[in-house]
Amino acid sequence: MTPTIFLVILCLGVASAVIVPEAQLDAELQEQKDKEVLIKAVWSKFMKTNKLHSSENDQETEGSNIEMSASGQLTDEELMKIMTTVLHPMFEEEENKPQPVVDDPEFEDYTESGDGFFVPNQPQ
């Protein structure tokens, strides 16, 4: 077998093994992207309505004020990073605070003075 024939067979084998994109996976990916766009649109509409409602209530003397945090859009990693930066300094402050010194009574050895309590027939 000559090297050219071997090379042709190898090229044909590689060409036949090329991955063909599946239409079903592409459709699922497009559907997922459409859902994300819809979720973002609904979220932005909700936030606009929320801000409008809050601004209307700010003008009145009585009423409820609805506030929504943006943590609903954060991933788990982003939320953990924020919580770590907020809570970690709080716990460090508690650890670094000096503990109050409590006046402990001095240890008294009753065995030497004979003032101890006698317990007869104590099981061992």
Swiss-Prot record:
Transmembrane domains' residue ranges: none
Signal sequence, start to end: 1-18
GO biological process entries: JNK cascade
Biased composition (Acidic residues): 103-112
Predominant location category: secreted
Keywords annotated in UniProt: Secreted, Signal
Bias-annotated ranges (Polar residues): 62-74
Region (Disordered): 51-74, 91-124
Keyword set includes Secreted: yes
GO cellular component, one term: extracellular region
The keyword Amino-acid biosynthesis belongs to this UniProt entry's keyword annotation: no
Compartment list: Secreted, Extracellular space
Purpose: It may be a growth factor/hormone, perhaps involved in interaction between the maternal and fetal systems in maintenance of pregnancy.
Name recorded for this polypeptide: Trophoblast-specific protein alpha
Native source organism of the sequence: Mus musculus
Gene name tied to this protein: Tpbpa
